[in-house]
Amino acid sequence: MPSVQKTVVKKSHKFVIDCTAPAGKIVDVAAFEKYLHDRIKVDNKVGNLGSTVVISKDKSKIIINTTIPFSKRYLKYLTKKFLKFKQIRDFLRVVATTKNTYELRYFNIGDSESQE
């Protein structure tokens, strides 16, 4: 009986973190990209990205391409840690806009003041 070769198709994931909303350029996108590069864990090791996780920057968007199982929630966690590290967590929040996209937005402070 001939052996049958099975091909494993690697599924690629693409995540986007959109930093265009904060006017005034509060978020330094290059510093955020470096922060993600230094903090993302692969196989429980920091700095083990290799070719499995690719982080790129496009103007004010960060694009993460992975060929391994990767959690979108983990990116939200790292984004919130970066905002806390830069002490701008009080002004910005991380919102999921689509299935693979997060966006940084300001808190709606003006709406709560007008309701009181």
Curated annotation (Swiss-Prot):
BP terms from Gene Ontology: cytoplasmic translation
Gene3D superfamilies associated with the record: 3.30.1360.210
Keywords of the record: Ribonucleoprotein, Ribosomal protein
Record-given protein name: Large ribosomal subunit protein eL22A
Organism: Dictyostelium discoideum (Social amoeba)
Keyword Transcription tagged: no
Cysteines paired by S-S bonds: none
Keyword Chaperone among UniProt keywords: no
Gene name of this polypeptide: rpl22
